[in-house]
């Protein structure tokens, strides 16, 4: 099972100096992946902990590609209906190219009413817009020449397609994952809560003749109790969970260092 950690690309921890130090600490500790999050327009009443400051996730990952050399880079999750398909495909391909194939692309439909209003995007169309983006991304990564709005164009660079890991609740996400995705990013690391949906998703993939899905939950772990944390990871792995994104708040790189040390010790 891959061990990943959430890098705060928001709030006071999102300075270049702090993020670079944290990214290098995670890579040096042997962790598998660094993950960032996506928000574009935080309203004042949702700004606790971030002050409304969020760095763009794809821009951050492109920068992290130059700060690191081995560790995987992912976003959990890119809000698909916020993003126009063609520029997004170009950005995703650029990050994958600069990162030498280390990108993992989590995608979701979004939830925050205020952000949809700020972007002028109808929240009721978020599912259809997500499907549109996913279909376009698949087309771009499969073909040298792609068409948009009736105009053919060369899609280059065209590196290997990153895995598409879709967020959302099982009942809504699973049909979309079967059509467009390589796996699921649930919002819990509770083995009992994941037992039935992971089993169901694996069965759906098998019935469709697809390889087993990647399952990468965003979770916390009892890092102060290593035996208990290892037991939770073992239970998740037995279900078919392929990796985790560990999330914990930290004040600065000095506070991040013990987090990655304790997390990497579980490997």
Write out the residue ranges for each language-model feature:
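N-terminal beta1-alpha1-beta2 module of alpha/beta enzyme domains
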Residues: 1-67, 162, 261-267
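Hydrophobic faces of well-ordered beta-strands that scaffold small-molecule active sites
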Residues: 3-7, 34-36, 72-75, 103-107, ...
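Active-site mouth loops of central-metabolism enzymes
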Residues: 5-17, 76-86, 161-169, 216-227
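Short, acidic/polar
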Residues: 14-26, 88-92, 166-176, 224-237
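An alpha-helical appendage that flanks or caps ligand/catalytic pockets
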Residues: 27-28, 32, 124-160, 185-267
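Glycine-rich, proline-tolerant flexible connector loops at the mouths of alpha/beta enzymes
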Residues: 33-58, 79, 111, 188-193, ...
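Internal, glycine-rich beta/alpha segment that forms the wall or movable "lid"
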Residues: 42-48, 62, 75, 81-180, ...
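Glycine-enriched alpha-helix->loop->beta-strand junction motifs that scaffold or abut catalytic
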Residues: 67-70, 99, 178-185, 239-243
């Amino acid at each position: 099972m891959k061990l990943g950690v959430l890098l705060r690309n928001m709030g006071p921890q999102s300075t270049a100096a702090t993020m670079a130090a944290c990214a290098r600490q995670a890579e040096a500790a042997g962790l598998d992946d660094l993950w960032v999050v996506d928000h574009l327009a935080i309203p004042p009443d949702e700004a606790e902990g971030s002050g409304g400051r969020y760095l763009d996730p794809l821009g951050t990952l492109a920068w992290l590609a130059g700060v690191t050399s081995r560790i995987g880079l992912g976003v959990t999750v890119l809000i698909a209906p916020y993003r126009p398909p063609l520029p997004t495909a170009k950005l995703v391909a650029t990050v994958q190219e600069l990162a030498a194939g280390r990108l993992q692309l989590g995608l979701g439909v979004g939830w925050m009413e205020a952000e949809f209003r700020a972007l002028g995007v109808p929240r009721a169309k978020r599912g259809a817009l997500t499907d549109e983006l996913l279909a376009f991304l698949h087309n771009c990564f499969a073909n040298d020449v792609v068409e948009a709005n009736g105009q053919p164009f060369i899609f280059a660079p065209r590196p290997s397609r990153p895995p598409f890991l879709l967020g959302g609740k099982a009942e809504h996400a699973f049909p979309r994952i079967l059509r467009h995705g390589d796996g699921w990013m649930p919002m819990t690391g509770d083995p009992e809560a994941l037992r039935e949906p992971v089993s169901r998703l694996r069965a759906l993939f098998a019935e469709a003749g697809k390889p087993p899905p990647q399952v990468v939950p965003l979770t916390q772990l009892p890092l102060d109790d290593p035996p208990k944390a290892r037991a939770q990871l073992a239970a998740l792995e037995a279900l078919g969970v392929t990796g985790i994104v560990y999330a914990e708040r930290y004040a600065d790189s000095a506070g991040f260092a013990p987090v990655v040390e304790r997390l990497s010790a579980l490997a």
